[in-house]
Amino acid sequence: MMNMIEWTKHVLESDDTKLIYWLTLLMVCMIVDTILGIVIARINPKEKFSSFKMKTGILIKVSEMIIALLAVPFALPFPAGLPLLYTVYTALCVSEMYSIFGHLRVVDDKSNFLSIIEGFFKQTYRKDKGDK
């Protein structure tokens, strides 16, 4: 177990490996979103499986990944480049997670992410108030 912790510390020492970590996380989120979308469209009788929608979604994900990869050599020479890349990668990951939550019916298309977080904190605060 200690070797794993040391390895994780070593991996996250440099900015290069942090960028690779964020790109890997983004890629995993995209793969999970795509697989969930295909599986849910296939097994849910209410959803009509559309190969056009699937191809469009995959094309959008591939283009987002290409832009994310091409942004690295353009952003790193500038002082604010690295924080900008982290911000963009975080936004892309949050967008993919929102899409995953949409597939799982945790959120719908009419709600926004901040209202979901706000509702969560309001419910948590009410529970804490009731316990006292």
From Swiss-Prot:
Q: How does it sit in the membrane?
A: Multi-pass membrane protein
Q: What is its main location?
A: host cell
Q: Which GO terms describe its cellular component?
A: host cell plasma membrane; membrane
UniProt keyword annotations, A-Z: Cytolysis, Host cell inner membrane, Host cell lysis by virus, Host cell membrane, Host membrane, Late protein, Membrane, Transmembrane, Transmembrane helix, Viral release from host cell
Q: Which residues cross the membrane?
A: 62-80, 86-107
A Gene Ontology biological process in which this protein takes part is:
killing of cells of another organism
Annotated compartments: Host cell inner membrane
Q: Which residues lie on this side of the membrane: Periplasmic?
A: 81-85
Pull the Cytoplasmic topological domain ranges from the record: 1-61, 108-132
Against InterPro entries, the record matches this protein to: Phage_holin_4_1
Q: Does the keyword Transmembrane helix apply?
A: yes
Family the UniProt entry places it in: Belongs to the bacteriophage holin family. phi29likevirus holin subfamily.
Per the entry's comment, what about the domains? Isoform Holin has 3 transmembrane regions whereas isoform Antiholin lacks the first transmembrane region. The C-terminus acts as a cytoplasmic regulatory region.
Q: Which protein are we looking at? A: Antiholin
Give the source species.
Answer: Bacillus phage B103
